[in-house]
Structures are given as C-alpha cells and as structure tokens.
C-alpha cells in the first residue's frame, strides 16, 4: 500500500465551526479535526492560540507544512481581515489577495480572501469560503466555466467563465427556512420527519415553486405549510419538508435562469436534496468532489507561490 505524504494543513473555518485536514498533494484527507468554535465566536487575540492548540500534534510531526485557511476566519470580525477580491476573480486574483496571519508556532497562516460582486442594480454581494470551493471544483473537473451551486444557510450561485468567477447571487434559503420553521406560526404544527425517504411534502413544495408567477406568490405558498396541516392534506412530519421544497425550488428557478445543468458543492445530504429538486424542475445538478475546499486551497497555495517567484 502506497503512502502519500502530507503537503499542507487545510483549515475550513466558518461562522460556527472549524474543520482541519492533514492533506496530501491530491487533496485527500490523511487526518481530520472538527471543532465547534467558529471564527466569529472568538475574540481578537484568541484565534491564533486556539488554532495552534488544535494543530499542535500535526505541526510537531510536520513542522514545515504550510497552513491555509478559508471562510469567515478572514472576515473583519475574524482573525485577520482578508479584503474581498472583486469579480471577475480567478485563481490569480484570489491568490494575490491572500493575507498571512502571523503565528510563531504555525509559521504563519495563509488566509484566502472572499469575493465580492455587484448585480445589475449595483447592489453588492459577498462570499467567504465558497470561492475556494469553486476553485477546487474547477481544479477537480479541469474546466474553466460553468454554473456552481453552493447550498447552505446563505446559498450561492456562481457563474464562471475563463476560469474566473464573473458574478454570483446569494439566496438566504437555509436561514429563511430555519426562521420560518422555528419563529413563525408555520412551525407550530410541524413534526420531525418519521421516514427520511418519504418525499411527498418536499416534492409538493418544489411543484408549488414551479407554479409561482408573481413576486409575492412565494409568501402565499409558504402559508400553505400551515393550512395543509390544518386540513389534513399533509401529515405533520411532511410540513417542514413542504416548506423546504418550496424554498429550495424557488431558489433553483431564480438561480438557474433557464440553465439546464450546474455543479453542486456541499454536504452530501444537502446536495442530494438540491439534486432531487433540480430533477423535478428540469435542472441537472451534478455533485462535485467532497474535498473541494482543500483542492481550492492547494490551488491558491501554488498560485501564491508562483506569483512570488
């Protein structure tokens, strides 16, 4: 059995959690650390000692390995701010905008910047962490164009041409679902799913999204998550599924803009949910490799090294 030596320590440090990987040159994880302290939960001065304590064993065994971090760790409220790179932004622009966070024990941590864009009205949009995943997907698939979907609390739909992110939109799908379910009248009749394979409610919600015609129709269709329960048209455990399908379906219809295929990047369960909704709506969503963040960080590290030569 061949041994792949570690090439870097990859850190995906978001708002509420952290994952670190001891990775080889192909982005495969040789070891993994998960922690529940997000970048925004720490005060200034706490990030470096916290990360150093998590990575101490790896750095003791591999003292010269570079450490690359992406996500909210580079936000203004994070460890060290890595200002947004403006679209269009590809590997060269993102690698050139990385920032080194000082750390004697870690040898400095290279932080990947986020990316900013403006829509047709001039309204700004931002992402942090997703740009690294997009770069990783591009490297894995060896192509330089396409639509990339990154579902989550704040889902992103990124458009790539010539290897550069030329624009993207954020949809508050995950956060809107949680808020409506947990803090409005819609959640009062909802119950946890009994059978994870039961898709009646989810499919009904996606179908409802496909029928939306006017901007306010989504708000009307959302209220059906209550009335379907009141009149027994859906069991309690399918009401949240209906709401999820409605919001995910509305996002896909808005984000796809008539495009019939895209690449989806994210956690397997969420990717599968989007893939199912896309199939109902005629949009083929193909999953990207699970290690896109690490692959993107490898590309950024190489790009930064090349720029320095």
Language model features by range: what are they?
Residues 211-250:
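Adenine-nucleotide phosphate-binding core of ATP-dependent small-molecule kinases
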Residues 8-12, 66-68, 146-150, 263-264:
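Short glycine-aspartate micro-motif
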Residues 17, 260-277:
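Glycine-rich phosphate-binding loops at beta-strand->alpha-helix junctions
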Residues 29-65, 74-81, 188-189:
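N-terminal phosphate-binding loop and adjacent alpha-helix
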Residues 3, 7-46:
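Short glycine-rich, Thr/Ser-proximal phosphate-binding strand/loop in the N-terminal lobe
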Residues 58-124, 162:
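Short beta-strand-loop/turn "lid" adjacent to the catalytic site in phosphate-handling enzymes
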């Amino acid at each position: 059995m061949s041994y792949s030596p570690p090439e870097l320590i990859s850190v995906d440090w978001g708002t509420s959690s952290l994952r670190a990987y001891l990775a080889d040159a192909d982005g495969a994880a040789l070891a993994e650390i998960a922690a529940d302290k997000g970048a925004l939960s720490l005060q200034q001065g706490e990030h470096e000692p916290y990360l150093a304590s998590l990575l101490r064993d790896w750095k003791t065994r591999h003292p010269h390995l570079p450490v690359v971090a992406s996500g909210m760790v580079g936000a203004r409220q994070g460890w060290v701010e890595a200002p947004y790179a403006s679209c269009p932004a590809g590997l060269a622009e993102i690698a050139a905008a990385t920032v080194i966070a000082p750390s004697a024990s870690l040898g400095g941590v290279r932080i990947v910047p986020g990316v900013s864009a403006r829509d047709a009205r001039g309204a700004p949009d931002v992402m942090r962490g997703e740009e690294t995943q997009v770069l990783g997907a591009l490297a894995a698939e060896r192509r330089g164009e396409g639509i990339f979907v990154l579902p989550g609390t704040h889902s992103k739909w990124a458009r790539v041409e010539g290897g550069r992110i030329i624009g993207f939109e954020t949809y508050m799908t995950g956060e809107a679902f949680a808020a409506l379910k947990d803090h409005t009248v819609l959640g009062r009749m909802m119950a946890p799913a009994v059978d994870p394979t039961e898709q009646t409610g989810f499919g009904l919600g996606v179908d409802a999204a496909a029928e939306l015609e006017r901007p306010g129709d989504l708000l009307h269709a959302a209220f059906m998550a209550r009335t379907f329960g009141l009149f027994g048209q859906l069991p309690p455990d399918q009401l949240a599924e209906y709401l999820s399908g409605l919001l995910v379906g509305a996002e896909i219809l808005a984000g796809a803009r008539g495009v019939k295929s895209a690449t989806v990047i994210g956690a397997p369960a969420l990717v599968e949910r989007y893939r199912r909704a896309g199939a109902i709506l005629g949009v083929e969503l193909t999953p990207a490799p699970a290690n896109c963040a690490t692959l993107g960080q490898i590309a950024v590290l190489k790009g930064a090294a090349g720029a320095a030569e």
